[in-house]
Amino acid sequence: MLPRIANQRAIVDRRALADAVSAAFAEQGDRSRPAVVELLRGALDSGRAELARRLEARPSAGTECAHGQAFLVDQLVRVIHDHVVGKVYRASNRSTGERIAIIAVGGYGRGEMAPHSDVDIAFVTPIKPTSWCEQVIEAILYFLWDLGLKVGHSSRSLDEVVRMAKSDLTIRTALLEGRYVWGDRDLFDAASARFWNEVVNGTEKQFVAEKLQERNERHKRLGDSRYVVEPNVKEGKGGLRDLHTLYWIGKYIHKVRDASELVDVGLLTAEEYRAFRRAENFFWAVRCHLHAITRRAEDRLTFDLQREVAMRMNFADRPGKSAVERFMQYFFLQAKQVGSLTGVFLAQLDGQFARQKRSFFASLRSRRKKVGPFFIEGGKLGVPAEDTFQQDPVRLVELFAVAASEKVEIHPEAMRLARRDAGLIDAAVRKDQRANALFLDVLTSRNDPETVLRWMNEAGVFGRFVPDFGRVVAQMQFDMYHHYTVDEHTIRAIGLLASIEKGEAKADHPLASEVVGKVASRRVLYVATLLHDIAKGRRGDHSVLGAEVAMKLCPRLGLSAAETELVAWLVRWHLLMSATAFKRDLADYKTIADFVNTVQSQERLRLLLLLTIVDIRAVGPGVWNSWKRQLLGDLFVSAEEVLRLGHKQHGRAERIIAKKKAVGAILKERDNLIGTVGRQLGDAYWIAEPEDIIALNLQQMDQALGELLSVEAHWYPARGATLVTVLAADHPGLFYRIAGGIHLAGGNIIDARIHTARNGTAVDNFLVQDPLGRPLNEASQIERLKNAIADALANRVKLVPQLAARPLARPRADAFDVRPIVIFDNKASNRFTVIEVGARDRPALLNRLARALFEARLIVHSAHIATYGERAVDTFYVTDVLGEKVDSEARMKAVEKRLLEAAEDRKVKDAA
């Protein structure tokens, strides 16, 4: 039965609607159908409008909106049924078999619907449906379909209902929430009685096991974290479906009719039930807003919708945190609460089954083993008494330290008590030496720190013990780059670090796996990983603010002054290595020298490499790739050589000789090319390019002698990209035209080096991937690349309009406000001016920027492209036409203006 709906007739007046339908039929008879549909549609539209008005007036009243939607559909179904049975297929003398019960099932049965939810209906008949029953059911369905409702329906006899419910979990779950809507009430009661007696009775344990398995598979399918930044409100981890699962299990086992009765049967406390209702109401509000905004059954809270839902639900900006970030933080806190409720619910369930002589989870209950103030029983860590933590709040930290050292799960009842008593952690506990030592044991555990820290976070102990961490719990970053909340990202980074240390990541991270064994201070590395994003969401640079947090927190954790200083340095500079590797020219010695000048020691270099890798990896799937691994490895090796040899490192001439020798080893019997075509290439080329690319370039130059244009493309596994080499007569605008051709072929340039041989031939090397970071390695893709470049250079295509028409690989980037920025740096290189342009990522951005540089009469010598979700950062090493740096203020202002115009989101007329 639905809860009482306030002012029902403002939503729909069933009697008035039924009278209007009857009047239409009386007037038009069999020709009345269009008029009846129009009346019904009008009632549906006005009902939806009234519910939308109520949601706008009370934007957090989610369950009220959901019940209102179900009420509206109920009334329409009743009017349609009475019209069909009483007028369209009126039967004066029906047999006992000509009876129909209309049962709402699934979410509709529960009385909870979003504006565009499916309408799930079961038509039940006493025996196999007669022709009259079939006609009535079909007519009812056609009316519902004509209203534009998406109807899920079944038509079965009583026996079929029972038989199918026994064999199909989905049908059983749907019928579990079966609710009488209209029709034959006695038939509904008979179906309900048989369902409980013949289907449910004796299958409770099987149902629970199947529902939990179904839940786990759903989580895995949707991203097994409740902190995915574009969550599915209905199906995602910690969402509505998880709450429904608890209700289904409670109903199946204890026959509860409402979630409030979960308290009466001992599965939730009154306080936990209030948390259940709070989360449910909030998620229903979000879901109803999503349907209202999109006008469809949209349950995914995507970036473009998050801002609007936050606004509708009256979230406002606060210093350092936008309205959408505050809204999403509240969302994730509710999802976290659902996870906690699930744990305690299942713990109580386990206990109830255990009291029936056998544990539900079938764990053999061995003799208790005492561990400090706790015990281990059945492979789980438990607490002996309700007041265990109240006696000594330090035990709240000790619980997790014991779980880490003993490699055991924490019993859900112990988690429940820890969650309840987390508030006992005060300033005295935080200062306690033993508590801090225990926390450090968890953080630096050689077993599984990620899992235990996640438990600690779920219980609320982590954020209470480290309040700065508590500030980033459930905090999202409103961008497309970070896939997880800050706390989840941090915990994952710690887990990745532990995995590298155990040698489990050698294939993916050979350098890191080798370096980790040379690190002098594990504690520094783990604490720095914990703190690297600790100041996210505050006003100011989170790296600088995080270093300040480290200086205060590390001594409390028991770190020495030297360790504290090193942690603070790592937090302050945790973005330095990736910024240098991905946005600077590693072949320019000044890049390495500047980097080393900041790093200053091999220990810092090792620690920074490891922190950088786990930070990038923990951002989310698809962010790490072999190209990034190669760049970080190149930077590490170059920096380590400078730190190790200092001024004794090889000079420019010696490095070129060594490079030529290495190239000769690759070319083997063709090593004569070094002295023939290789003569055309200057020293800068030999220093900049790696040996394997030089070998390929020399062979291509030899084969292309006398040709006006040569384009080659090879799959380049070492870089995780396709190497595209273009040989052509050098002329102004060559670079932007090549870039345009590559973009037209579906390529995304991630790195480019531009050289001019002594004979005037341009030797340009590009590393190319598809827009999703994958290589273009199929024969058809490579052929398309070659043809597109040739067409662009021959002016056979109008680049700009064609590029502008290409769809964006990441269309959701439009949800973000990315203001273009241009930065000039004349200190980053001895020979070149370095220009860094940040802008919204979109098709052919590089082409636009390169064209702007060409129009500003600048020569591009190398380009380095990095993307961070919706934001692209393109870095160019340039000179003027005379080979000089751009250093006049007026010139820089003029170039900046051109680049900002090119970076703007607007259509550009083709002048190519």
Swiss-Prot record:
A biological-process GO annotation: regulation of nitrogen utilization
Means of activity regulation: Uridylyltransferase (UTase) activity is inhibited by glutamine, while glutamine activates uridylyl-removing (UR) activity.
Mitochondrion keyword on record: no
InterPro entries: ACT-like_dom_sf, ACT_dom, HD/PDEase_dom, HD_domain, NT_sf, PII_UdlTrfase/GS_AdlTrfase, Polymerase_NTP_transf_dom, UTase/UR
Residues covered by region (Uridylyltransferase): 1-369
Residue ranges, annotated region (Uridylyl-removing): 370-722
Cofactor: Mg(2+)
Function description: Modifies, by uridylylation and deuridylylation, the PII regulatory proteins (GlnB and homologs), in response to the nitrogen status of the cell that GlnD senses through the glutamine level. Under low glutamine levels, catalyzes the conversion of the PII proteins and UTP to PII-UMP and PPi, while under higher glutamine levels, GlnD hydrolyzes PII-UMP to PII and UMP (deuridylylation). Thus, controls uridylylation state and activity of the PII proteins, and plays an important role in the regulation of nitrogen assimilation and metabolism.
Family the UniProt entry places it in: Belongs to the GlnD family.
Protein name: Bifunctional uridylyltransferase/uridylyl-removing enzyme
UniProt source species: Novosphingobium aromaticivorans (strain ATCC 700278 / DSM 12444 / CCUG 56034 / CIP 105152 / NBRC 16084 / F199)
